[in-house]
Amino acid sequence: MHKNSPEKKYRLKILLLHLKKITKIMSMLTSRMKNLHPYIPGEQPKDRVYIKLNANENPYPPCKELLDGLKKEISNFPSKLSLYPDPDSNELKKAIAKMLNETGGVLSRCSVSQKNVSPSESDKIGFEITPEMIYTGNGSDEVLSFVFYAFFDSKNTLVLPEFTYSFYPVYAGFYGIETDIVPMKNDWSLDIEKILSLAKKNGSGLIFANPNAPTGISLSRLNVRKMLEKSDPDKIFVVDEAYCDFGGESCIPLLKDFKNLLIVRTFSKSLSGAGLRLGYIVSNPEIISSVTTVKNSLNHFPLDALTQISGKIACENAWYYAECAKKIVSERESFQKFLEGNGWFYIPSKTNFVLVKNPSVSGKEVYTKIKENGILVRHFDTNGISDYVRITIGTKEQMDKLKEIMKKIK
């Protein structure tokens, strides 16, 4: 094409018009919008030809009772789709409270007998969780955004661990909250004393994931209790228990003694409900009321009817998800033994994923080699963990295939 051809001039004209439109739109944006750094989720391939071990989803499907019950409910009551849903998800909250009372908040340690579950002795809550102590929302991400809005002030700097759920700094930026980042200890655990010291100095509340993501390390309930005892009782203390069902110790029993404790949980991991977008809070009724006020100021009907029905049925069949969680924990332990025996470094996990490193191959290359063989894992291009990949625990068949691939990575 000649450098002065009409076609080239036309393309240049179109490009300039496009840039002008972008510039005009940018001039409309607030300074808040210009400074946003959005969360980057794991790959979600549209063709679904990959085995997905990159987003910490449950490899097992929802229980049969959920699928059958959903069809029956909609067939018998089609108006549930034509009318607005219950804005407070009351039946779902009752089901969540009942499930927590029956399981203690750790499915993988429950006893299962004839479709009934009971908590291990160490996981018994010791008091009754009531529906008034539950808040439900569109996934724990929306729930967390409301928590940030309600309890973390831009006047106070928020303390975050160096490696944590990457949506926390995103929300901090969204709400104009400065952050202090505390490096992990040499064993990848949280530097509790440093976190508490900075939080006290900054006059802020606290938030952290337990078990932690992406490291998989879990703090004991006793250690969390000690943190609460040293924290300001007038500041919110948020524990994100997204992965607790796979072997952590739930902090739900601590709610009786600490009125500033707020626990966030999700249906996306242990309850095979990532596609539902259903998360919830367990806390004292006054805190629940405050988060509800935020919800009602933004979206009075956050949970659709199908999600409410599905969540309720899932809770009523906790026995099934407890069995799935036990299988995932068993595969995790088997995978960690494989890593030890084949020269891979890993951080011992209490979640449904493991953070692993090959001593002689970069994290990016490990990710690429595994992907070339039809499996997706997660690589973080982040200083400190860029040599690692995070691998979700799948079914035995999926993990056996992964092991064969990893044996060849030298």
Language-model segment annotations:
Residues I25-G105, R109-C110, E121-G139, F146:
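N-terminal small-domain helix-loop-helix segment of the aminotransferase-like
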Residues K21-K24, L222, K369-N373, R378, ...:
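PLP-dependent enzyme catalytic core of the Aspartate aminotransferase-like
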